[in-house]
Amino acid sequence: MLSLLNHLRRRKQHHIRCFHHHHNRVSFKSVKMVFSRFLRLILLLSLVSSSFSYTTSPSNSTASDQTLRPQEEIQKLKLIRNELLKINKPAVKTIQSSDGDTIDCVPTHQQPAFDHPLLHGQRPMDPPEMPKGYSKDDESYEDSQLWSLTGESCPEGTVPIRRTTEQDMLRASSVRRFGRKIRRVRRDSTSNGHEHAVGYVSGRQYYGAKASINVWSPIVTSQYEFSLSQIWVIAGSFTHDLNTIEAGWQISPELYGDTYPRFFTYWTSDAYRTTGCYNLLCSGFVQTNRRIAIGAAISPRSSYKGGQFDIRLLIWKDPKHGHWWLQFGSGVLVGYWPAFLFTHLRQHGSMVQFGGEIVNTRPGGSHTSTQMGSGHFAGEGFGKASYFRNLQMVDWDNTLIPVSNLKILADHPNCYDIRGGTSRVWGNYFYYGGPGKNPRCP
């Protein structure tokens, strides 16, 4: 337990980089508009400054200083546009979503994954054998995303990819590490910290995991914080050789520019140092379906004392080829992480975690009010607190079995907590989450 708690407190910063300044009272839309106009002004000034510099003495430090920042901005914009050319591939069809996203239907063999030298010129693998014990009988409704509610779909032979915009990259603290987690995180869990409420299993060999995750729209109070709920499949030590495969939903204003819960994936093979990324923002994950867009908003979402909705995620290792596959919802194979991406996960996982995480930047010196899950404590139960249900793992024989010896941990229980249980219908489950700042969590 102590080793996991220490890991959680020093884990590489999850799903959003934290900045030291906060703009809680400024709307994200206003920030984007003002910043966009500012950049246009900078470009104009740079042209004027460049012309002016030809008639100014080289010894004039004031004139030199005036042209320095515009040149830096121009270089940054050039770098952004070059990165966008790598990420955004030519589309055969484009779909506009009601949430402002643009979904590009990209030929399957031209998606970002195939820029990788070991995949270049290849095509996606055929679907693998499903784990024994898998059944679609409990899938009661068709999971959906906002973009698909338009009635439009991508044609056969293509995959839907959320288009990355210039504004997406301008929100990032580092253009070169856009779409990645930072390599170093402060160990002080009370400042710029990551707080968790998770269930986990360890001590065996794990070849996959499955769960239904309740979907909510928790409040995220700062652009530089996030709230997520996900599955982690982990291998290696919690140092430089950490391997992880991650999938779930997240609200991440910095990464996406809004507060919609979005389906996401992540991977790393070196503890988030130089490998891995979110979604399809680098060469790695290979998408194989035309119905689910990674990074797109999930619909519907749950409401307090109202309708409850969840997404079913299954991650498992193909015993024939060794790739790690991801299934979303009602039997939709999203794609796979190729085996060669990893070191330890080429064999198996050594730990599986399920649960929630938030970033706490301590605005104004107090705990954040960013919510986890539904924003309500676990004790409120169904319809009020968020849940994970039907927790399962995949064993060495490619068989889905119920999770056993599930341990639960909340590292800040006065802010976010967790309560586990079992039932005939839900199997192993837990409720988790909380409001963040409150009288017991100042």
For the regions a protein language model found, what residue spans apply to each?
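Exposed, interaction-prone regions of secreted/extracellular proteins
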Residues: 31-442
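Classical eukaryotic N-terminal signal peptides for Sec-dependent ER targeting/secretion
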Residues: 1-44, 52-55
